[in-house]
């Protein structure tokens, strides 16, 4: 694991919406010595949030200098690429059981849950992230991804 401070990064934009998008965009001079560390799928950390680089684009700026633009998604987006989930039926279950199933085999675990509603429903989602979004929709509350501790939490709104 290589750690480096990207002190020459600029135009840094972090978009983080509750129950929504979470991504990071920034630029760095192409000639920056740390530019070579920035490859697709590498992890980045900004404060306590962890992101995975999805695109690295090199373009000429208006001044003629080459600039590297980075787009990275929060680490939890990896859950969209989890192993395929099979159809599941839940009878009067709290959110914990379907969340545990959704996270099985992903390296993520269930964190604190303050939503105590019981629901009966059938899951037809194909990956962990879409299943977690469905769980949030069915049980209510706010879904939070703790990218540092690799946990998914759901809080009462």
Report residues per predicted region:
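Residue-level signal for tight coil/turn positions that link beta-strands
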Residues: 21, 48, 147-149
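Short beta-strand-centered interaction patches in the first periplasmic/extracellular domains
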Residues: 57-79, 112-157
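Short, solvent-exposed secondary-structure boundary motifs
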Residues: 1-7, 42-47, 129-137
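Generic structural detector for well-ordered beta-strands
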Residues: 13, 27, 52, 71, ...
């Amino acid at each position: 694991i290589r750690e480096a401070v990207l002190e020459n990064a600029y135009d840094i934009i972090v978009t983080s919406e509750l129950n929504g998008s979470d991504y990071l965009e920034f630029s760095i001079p192409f000639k920056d010595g740390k530019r070579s560390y920035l490859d697709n799928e590498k992890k980045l950390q900004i404060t306590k949030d962890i992101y995975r680089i999805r695109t690295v684009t090199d373009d000429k700026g208006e001044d003629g200098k080459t600039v590297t633009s980075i787009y990275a998604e929060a680490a939890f987006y990896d859950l969209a690429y989890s192993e395929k989930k099979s159809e599941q039926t839940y009878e009067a279950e709290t959110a914990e059981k379907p969340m545990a199933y959704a996270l099985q085999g992903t390296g993520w675990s269930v964190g604190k849950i303050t939503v105590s509603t019981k629901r009966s429903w059938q899951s037809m989602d194909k990956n962990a992230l879409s299943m977690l979004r469905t769980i949030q929709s069915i049980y209510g509350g706010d879904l939070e991804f703790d990218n540092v501790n690799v946990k998914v939490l759901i809080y009462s709104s």
